[in-house]
């Protein structure tokens, strides 16, 4: 039976040179086919999408692999079989930043998400940065409107909740949001991922990769895990 590929939950820096070592690691031993979805940025318009596609193209060129853009901007395109077919043969599927609720709601239960999940379970690496990392959990809060109910996520890592950009975000994290985020069911771990940093592996054993740290958050405080640390997250 084929083992699922690794998951990378990235705090920031997708497609930038600072995280080339991470993306190279995720592609190592896999098909050199770098599948990219800028869906989370679709509400910002075509200019934003074009920027993400250009960054992704530059990253693929530095890594010497093929860039494949999956042009999902709404649920219609997410359910298009021809669009979903672009995921086939991926070595790495990457969900970049933007709006976490929009990304999760757009992909949830669609042909494209099924294709991504199949590729991942078949051994492809699966990465989400910022909004993408949040959407890979099963609990997607609207960080700009913390009192709104969270949306269901894509549930690739249902035992985690993720706060990206944590080093920048933590200093202005509203108490009401932090209280809600750490109020989790048994077996769910809340992690803050600093910028230019990733939590890589899964589902239970992870490594901190990148420039800074990952933090485990509880009602009693936070514990730092610097780059190179191994972190265990129980699944229930």
Label the predicted regions.
Residues 41-98, 102:
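Portal/gating segments that form or line small-molecule/metal binding sites
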């Amino acid at each position: 039976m084929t083992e699922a590929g690794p998951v990378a939950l990235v705090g920031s820096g997708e497609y930038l040179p600072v995280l080339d070592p991470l993306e190279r690691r995720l592609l190592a031993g896999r098909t050199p086919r770098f599948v990219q979805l800028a869906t989370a940025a679709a509400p910002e318009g075509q200019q934003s999408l074009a920027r993400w596609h250009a960054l992704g193209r530059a990253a693929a060129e530095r890594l010497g692999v093929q860039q494949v853009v999956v042009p999902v901007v709404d649920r219609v395109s997410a359910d298009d079989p021809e669009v979903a077919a672009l995921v086939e043969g991926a070595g790495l599927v990457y969900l970049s930043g933007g709006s976490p609720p929009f990304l999760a709601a757009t992909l949830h239960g669609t042909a494209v998400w099924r294709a991504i999940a199949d590729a991942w379970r078949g051994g492809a690496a699966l990465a989400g940065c910022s909004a993408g990392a949040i959407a890979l959990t099963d609990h997607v809060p609207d960080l700009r409107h913390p009192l709104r109910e969270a949306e269901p996520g894509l549930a690739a890592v249902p035992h985690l909740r993720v706060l990206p950009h944590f080093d920048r975000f933590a200093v202005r994290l509203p108490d009401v949001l932090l209280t809600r985020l750490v109020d989790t069911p048994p077996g769910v771990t809340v992690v803050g991922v600093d910028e230019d940093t990733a939590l890589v592996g899964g589902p239970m054993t992870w490594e901190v990769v990148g420039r800074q740290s990952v933090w485990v958050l509880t009602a009693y405080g936070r514990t730092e895990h610097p780059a190179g640390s191994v972190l265990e997250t129980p699944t229930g």
